[in-house]
Amino acid sequence: YAEAVAAVMASRRAEGVATGRAVGALVRELVRDVRSTIAGDAPRVGYWDLLIAHDDRTGHPTNLSPSLPPSLPPIYRRLFGEVPLGLSDLYQPRPQLGAPCRKVCETWLNRQRTALLVVGDRGAGKRTLVNRVRAELHGELPVHWLSLGPHLASEARVCAALCEATGAPYAGSFSEFSRLVPLLGGRRVLILENAEQLFVRTPDGLRRMQDFLDLVRATDDALLWVVLIAAPAATLLETCLKLPMYFGQVVRVPAETGTFIETMIRSRHRVSGFGLRFKARRAPALQRLRRPFTRADMLPDPGEEWFVDLERMCAGNLRQALDYWLLSARLDV
């Protein structure tokens, strides 16, 4: 009898421990939900996994650590970089931005002086937009693309790069280069990316930017200047130097909508040929307590919910959206 009582008591204690653990886990989950609700926390990157289906079922991960999920194939990752000109299926049209760019090109081809300024945040799609316009001009005029950076920001180095691209004799300053442009013989297109690298918030930085803008105005009959600049620097230069006055057209690349981002990502994934499914998440404990019997309105379609949160996390920035996608994607092996 004593042994039976001891067995029952041990069983009850084990059940109590298990119940306590379950209740403790639920309480901790509720506390986290309440805290996140009060703080208004947004989902973190990777909150849900994207399961990219592929045909290799051997289970051999490509990462060095076998405990980590297999990394995405390089060919898949390349689809979420800059749009190659040959893959038109990846490009999502933005007619409200492309039309004014084409108009500037047509105006300049008709021998009228003009220049194009493209303003937008980093990752907003300025380069892709200009690439599409450049593709339409291909074969008509020589096009030279110059990307500025820390290694290429001083006036002397930029002038040297401009001379090398256009075949002009060496020039050490913007004013000297402007005097050499008539000697080039023929018209051409110059695309200057990351133009904000020329600007420094000092008197010398303002002078250098002013000299560059004077170069654009003095040579826009022989050179079609297409200047790409980040939005914060453009805002300062509009105040200090009246930046838009030096360009016939200013195109501002805005943040995109969630619908545009979803279409862009799905079209790129479709080209890969891989399958796709979204991992459904469990409803938070707070929502389960509020609506214990109506789960349909708590858990929408996982894919739809994922893209809604993606729009909020990337704030309409295309580059960030593509990076978040690659960070969240996992091979389904």
Give the predicted meaning of each segment.
Residues 89-105:
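N-terminal pre-P-loop "Q-motif" helix
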Residues 1-87:
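Extended, charged/polar low-complexity intrinsically disordered regions
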Residues 115-117, 137-152:
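Conserved catalytic segments around the Walker B and adjacent sensor/switch elements
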Residues 113, 120, 197-205, 209-241, ...:
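Sensor-1/coupling segment of RecA-like P-loop NTPase cores
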Residues 111-131:
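Walker A/P-loop nucleotide-binding motif
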Residues 177-209:
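Conserved P-loop NTPase "ATPase switch" module shared by AAA+ and STAND
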Residues 251-303, 312-313:
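Conserved small helical "lid"/interfacial subdomain of P-loop NTPases
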Residues 152-172:
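Conserved NTP-binding/hydrolysis module of P-loop NTPases
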